[in-house]
């Protein structure tokens, strides 16, 4: 296929339906998932009231070297599909729970036979680890689209109304993670050349070598002139991942026609730190979030700070998803004290060392994840990965109680209580050395301090600030706003730098204006000279500018900044706290008496896991927390 034909195929077929109205958002699922679904746990969860089950009829192996799915592959050869294997997996669920509804992952990764059959050609590689080398290959797109549409047609016609949502799964760990480090293939090179030409830029002929695409001119920063080719290439590398997602989302909707929800794992700007964020293709999320063909997004709870006593948290800019009318599903895959954490090859499941050590810790940890999902308005599934994640009557009883609380409260409209926002910028990370250790400090590690400052917060993409109401936020943190051009400067002026807000700038805010790198830009934007060692504050015209020369502000500093900004602080203990207008939750490792301050007087405050009324007609109360524990308070007027 010629270069021109290759790129026409990509650009045309990935275009969204311009006339398609935004689809309805899916339900807030409370679901069960497993790589090894079995009758007993599905039946046990059904007895708890959990009627939604996620299946993954996969064709490929996972990163631990074992198959994702114990059943035979479905995609067995060119145009050959063994739907008897798929039907058997559906039957297993329905036999265990005849009332079940399904969520279903669709494996778009290259089967082993496909790589062997076509892999002598450049660009015909295993998408699990080389997604970026193959995602622009027309043959792969066409074959995989045919499989996807045949799969969906079979499910939609054989089991009408059974599947509530499909998940398009591809790339590393089926989460659209490109592990190819930007390396070349013939089809990637063709797509890159066409992408540059479409934007009126010179034909680059080749993909820049590692010495060019990894080069930084100013410390950790690329120069917008000297390193322009590298910046363009990394922008393309993320774009092509987003383009692949949108291509298959449109292909799926040609069959599903918005009768079931459609989702992906994507947008991990908070989680993919150094050695990952620049390389793995997730920085096109602003465009993907806007797609009318996608309804929901998924990620596991963060793998940072997930231990008992940790704060947990999300990998994505959750408030931006809400802003675009999308839903989010929180994957609770946290290792419990009963988890099968070593697979057949003797390899431990990632995150095992931060697992919950005993039954009490498991219950406290699962309650933390549940409370976070309930308060943030997300869906969830309990991921019984390789089996035995949720064993023992006490653990099952705890999940059953949480299901009852979900039934009682999940349908309520969410009332935000956040007066703090962290605004993250995808574009700026294209200008940063992807391997620099400091990258971990900007967003990945910063979440821990935010969750412990004593107040709830939102995470928003800079791309959404221009058309989002920002009035509720009193304290705004910019952990990585390194590129500020004229358009961003105007957004900041009109939406952020006003109304008495306190704005915290981190490390090198605005050091690049899109055309030049100049440390003087920092002072022009913030009123503070670039550099220094300590936090400095300056009163501006209608707002307060705070400059933090070092990233990853700790909880005590954030607590003090929030207090000075007039943010309501629920606690002073530097332990994880989550809140919205109707709920307050806290998680503790050590336990003891804790005093909570409410933003208003409440007629009744009830701790929902114990059923205790802990306060009446009060705006403060003290409660005793076990060690470890998660508490969830209902705030009734």
Feature locations, PLM:
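Aromatic-lined substrate-binding rim segments of carbohydrate-active enzymes
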Residues: 39-127, 152-154, 247-255
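Short, acidic/polar
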Residues: 34-46, 151-154, 275-289, 362-370, ...
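An acidic-aromatic substrate-binding cleft motif
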Residues: 22-51, 234, 420, 427
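Aromatic-lined carbohydrate-binding/catalytic grooves of carbohydrate-active enzymes
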Residues: 50-84, 269-283, 292-299, 303-305, ...
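Bacterial N-terminal signal peptides
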Residues: 2-12
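Carbohydrate-binding surfaces of carbohydrate-active enzymes
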Residues: 258, 291, 295-637
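Polysaccharide-binding and catalytic clefts of secreted carbohydrate-active enzymes
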Residues: 107, 115-303, 311, 317
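Hydrophobic faces of well-ordered beta-strands that scaffold small-molecule active sites
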Residues: 28-32, 53-55, 102-106, 164-168, ...
